[in-house]
Amino acid sequence: MATNRTFTMIKPDGVQNGHIGGIVNMITEAGFKIVSMKLTQLTVADAQKFYEVHAARPFYGELVAFMSRGPIVAAILEKDNAVEDFRTLIGATNPADAAEGTIRKKYATSIGENAVHGSDSDENAAIEGAFHFAGREQF
């Protein structure tokens, strides 16, 4: 297993519901190193660009509105097998289907408000990390 990076966001519901500390704690306890992190807010245009891969999907407009409604925490994480291990840590998109001990099981309230985003591939992790962090912000 090679050490690599993944990207995550604590979504507006996770921030609004006061779960930043709990989620970050779960991430670090799972062995991830936080190499970049910031509190920010996506504009509608930012959210449209970030999620443009979903533009043709029926939930796109709702997703863009949700992701731009309040602050998020964006982070780049490092660990052996980072993408796969983080996807396991966050759990299924639907918190009702998420395994016990996962972030979404503990902090998500619905499919739409599922607390966190995690990259689905090494390639997307690099793209998503670069979207939120300039090279000088990545350590």
Swiss-Prot record:
It is an enzyme of class 2 (transferase). One of its GO terms (biological process) is CTP biosynthetic process. It catalyses: a 2'-deoxyribonucleoside 5'-diphosphate + ATP = a 2'-deoxyribonucleoside 5'-triphosphate + ADP; a ribonucleoside 5'-diphosphate + ATP = a ribonucleoside 5'-triphosphate + ADP. GO terms for cellular component: cytoplasm. It is found in: Cytoplasm. One of its GO terms (molecular function) is ATP binding. It comes from the Bacteria. Its main location: cytoplasm. CDD domains: NDPk_I. InterPro entries: NDK-like_dom, NDK-like_dom_sf, Nucleoside_diP_kinase. Pfam families: NDK. Its EC number is 2.7.4.6. ATP binds at residues 11, 59, 87, 93, 104, 114. The active site is at residue 117. Its cofactor is Mg(2+). Major role in the synthesis of nucleoside triphosphates other than ATP. The ATP gamma phosphate is transferred to the NDP beta phosphate via a ping-pong mechanism, using a phosphorylated active-site intermediate. PANTHER family: NUCLEOSIDE DIPHOSPHATE KINASE (PTHR46161), NUCLEOSIDE DIPHOSPHATE KINASE DDB_G0292928-RELATED (PTHR46161:SF3). Belongs to the NDK family. This is Nucleoside diphosphate kinase.
